């Protein structure tokens, strides 16, 4: 399946390229997957094609209609809906299921992520806080909470959650990837690169962390190195598409920088990203 990219609604950011970093990792944070990334050049879904996901929608829709109170039916149906871009419907499904299963922590985790997916960050934080307890913290939920705080521009708070998650599972690449992007969003590209390199050095790391690293390296002007990183771990067709996208983002960044430096012209307003069909945490 070709790589696709999403832009979720974000706080004001200084550039289009950094706005892309807030592509919700949360958009791919399913309860059955290890994907809780703040944002990125989203990785492709190796498991399911778009046609596969549409079949999943039909399958789980039937099961959900027959037993809407079953949390597994609701979560699987919502996952398929999110994968096919039907995010608002996924929220509605999980909201109804959470009313009937108010103490099901896995369901609350899925609901919180889905809320973040549609930009309801404050409500997402509230729901995610009920998806685990201080006595039994879940590193995936901690990472998701950090990702939501990053969406709100509360970077220091977000890093506290990532630190707590890393105490539970040290050097987990999805947490490190989020942490690296948190630094990037606050314009500390050196720390971002260091952290993302640490993420990509871990065993079993997925392609997403490498694509995040590629964007951060490119934002520092090392374009050839960024393209080399962007091509890694991908089939030729997807690698080429990823490089094209990387070049587009970096080109937009350069145009904004040139506009800000042009004499006699007001600085360009901060970019907002808009929601579009998604790939990915």
Predicted features along the sequence, with ranges:
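Canonical tetratricopeptide repeat
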Residues: 76, 110, 143-144, 178, ...
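Structural marker of alpha-solenoid helical repeat scaffolds
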Residues: 66, 100-101, 131-135, 168, ...
């Amino acid at each position: 399946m070709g790589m696709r990219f999403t832009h979720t609604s974000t706080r004001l950011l200084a550039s289009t390229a950094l706005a892309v970093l807030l592509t919700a990792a949360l958009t791919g944070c399913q309860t059955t997957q290890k994907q809780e990334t703040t944002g990125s050049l989203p990785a492709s879904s190796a498991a399911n094609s778009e046609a596969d996901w549409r079949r999943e929608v039909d399958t789980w829709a039937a099961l959900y209609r027959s037993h809407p109170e079953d949390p597994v039916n609701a979560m699987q149906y919502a996952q398929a809906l999110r994968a096919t871009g039907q995010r608002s419907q996924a929220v509605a499904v999980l909201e109804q299921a959470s009313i009937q299963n108010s103490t099901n922590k896995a369901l609350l985790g899925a609901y919180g992520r889905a809320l973040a997916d549609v930009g309801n960050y404050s409500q997402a934080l509230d729901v995610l806080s009920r998806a685990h307890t201080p006595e039994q913290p879940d590193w995936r939920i901690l990472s998701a909470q950090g990702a939501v705080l990053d969406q709100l521009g509360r970077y220091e708070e977000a890093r506290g959650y990532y630190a707590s998650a890393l105490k539970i599972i040290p050097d987990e690449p999805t947490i490190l990837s989020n942490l690296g992007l948190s630094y990037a969003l606050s314009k500390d590209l050196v720390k971002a690169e260091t952290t993302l390199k640490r993420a990509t050095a871990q065993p079993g790391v997925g392609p997403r962390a490498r694509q995040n690293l590629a964007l951060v390296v490119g934002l520092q002007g090392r374009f050839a190195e960024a393209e080399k990183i962007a091509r890694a771990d991908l089939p030729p067709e997807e690698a080429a598409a990823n490089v094209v996208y990387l070049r587009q983002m970096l080109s937009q960044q350069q145009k904004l920088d040139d506009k800000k430096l042009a004499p006699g012209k007001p600085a360009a307003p901060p970019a907002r990203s808009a929601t579009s069909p998604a790939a990915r945490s």
